[in-house]
Each structure stands twice: as structure tokens, then as C-alpha cells.
Amino acid sequence: MRLLKVFDSKNYLDNFNSFERYACRAIIIKDNKVALVKSNLGYYKFPGGGIATGETRIDALVREVLEETGLQVKRDTIKEFGYTYEKRKSLFDDQGIFIQYSYYYICECYDEIIEQNLFDYEIEEEYSLAFMDIDDALEKNAAYQEEIDTFIIRDNFILNLIKEMIK
């Protein structure tokens, strides 16, 4: 899979301990709108999340999309898009480095939407499926980006790549 971008905040010391996380995220486009997860905090993100121990990337992608959106991925439509690499000081350990690989896949889903299976924090943020015009999603995220959440910066980068792709 091709590397799309490196996000390195350089806000850590090289001798810090590092923690690596691997995640899969879905790019689902329907009628020139992209499927995103909407939060009541005001941001939009790609559906997806962490890969569990022993799980393949594809299995993680299918599971995460179902859990966060209720959409069922058509496995035979899954295509690699690319991945991002993030490196920054950990939010949970002052002397830790957080490294994340986010693997993006283009895929299609069945029309039927079933019940979400959300974590407590996702319930608190009222995660819901939203098919968004890319410019609208970028605009909403730009307002939220005041807090400089790295996942918003990462997902906005991907949204801009998709915008160029579907022109």
C-alpha cells in the first residue's frame, strides 16, 4: 500500500518510549457524497478504528464500519487507497511517543443500515452516519480544527485527496 503522507509533530524526545497503533478507515462514496461519522462535538471523521490482535486489516475495516455506522461493507469491492503515518507525543504519557498507521480503503456498502455497536465515548458523542458533500465536511471540520485534533488534520488531508479524485 502506498504512503500518502507523514504527520510528524516533532513534539517529543527521541528517547521516549513509543506505542504503535494500527487502524483501518473506509472511504465510501455514494452519489458524490462521502460516508462519514458525525460527532455532536462538531467534527466528521472517516468510519474505522483499531485493528484487534489477530485480526486482518480487511476484517477490522468491515467490523469498524459496521460498529460505527451500521453499514455492511461489500467485501468484494474493497480496494487499497493508501496509508498515513502519524508520530507525536502521547496524550496519555508525558514521556511517550504515539505512532499510528491508518490504512484507508475504498469500498461499497449494502443499502440496508443496521444498528450501531458503539463504545461509551462514541455514544456520548452521539456518533451517527452522515453522507456529506466533501466541501461541507471540510468546512465543518475547519471550524472544529481550532482544537488542532490530529485526526481531523489527517482526515481533512484524505478528504482533499478524494475531492481531487472525483472531480
Annotate each PLM feature.
Residues 51, 84, 109, 134-137:
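Hydrophobic pocket-lining residues within nucleotide cofactor-binding pockets
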Residues 29-68, 72:
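Conserved Nudix-box catalytic region and its N-terminal flanking loop in Nudix hydrolases
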Residues 28, 106-108, 131-133:
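Short, well-ordered beta-strand micro-motif
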Residues 1-25, 31:
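Acidic, metal-coordinating catalytic segment for phosphate/diphosphate chemistry
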Residues 72-83:
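A short coil-to-beta-strand element that immediately follows conserved catalytic motifs
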Residues 86-116:
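Active-site-adjacent beta-strand/loop module that shapes the phosphate/pyrophosphate-binding cleft
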Residues 43-44, 114-167:
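Nudix hydrolase/Nudix homology domain
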